[in-house]
Amino acid sequence: MGENNWRLSFKDKAYDYFNRTIELLRGSKEMREMMLLSYYYGAEMSFLMNDSRIDEALKVGFEREKQIKRLKEVPQISEDYVDGQYSYLYAKLAYIYCMEKKYEKAEQYYQKYLSKKESHTPDGKMYSVPYLALSGQYEKVIDNCRGFKELMRTQQDTLNEQYLTVLRQEVKAYLGMHKYKEAAEIRETILTITDSINTRDRNN
């Protein structure tokens, strides 16, 4: 509900929903509710970042970090789940601090992100792409995108918005490196895939 309202630009309603839901879940010892609370912290943090409400996003991010620490103490919750939660959060915090031009703090959180196993998987590498792009580390952006594209190709899953998002990140990185030919080639691929998606949707 909160996410739908936010996407429909009913932002006051969206944040009210997030806050009420978080209050209901806060303090729960039930495993699913604890996991759900972490999810809602993450969703609200992302929306606050998109709305340039950076101080509030940081506050929510730190609350999520505390919640992940609580999840770590639950025996039924796997280490991999907790690792992934930390990985995603630390990549976001690195990006926020880079936006705020607090580069040393950003790098500290990037290193925390790299300390997690998830950060070295194709999926996890994509978490850091916004930070790497903002900090001008374009080669790493391209490397991370390449690995994720290979994963999607092996799954024969390239006709979707997620794949297009990865390609757009590559375009930005190549433009940042002034490699205009490579950027143009990927833009052609984006157009081809977009046409294929539109054709498929029409046929369905």
Describe the residue ranges of each PLM region.
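Hydrophobic positions within repeat-based interaction scaffolds
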Residues: 12-15, 55-58, 72, 81-84, ...
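Residue signature of alpha-solenoid helical repeat architecture, marking inter-repeat boundaries
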Residues: 32-35, 77-84, 119, 161
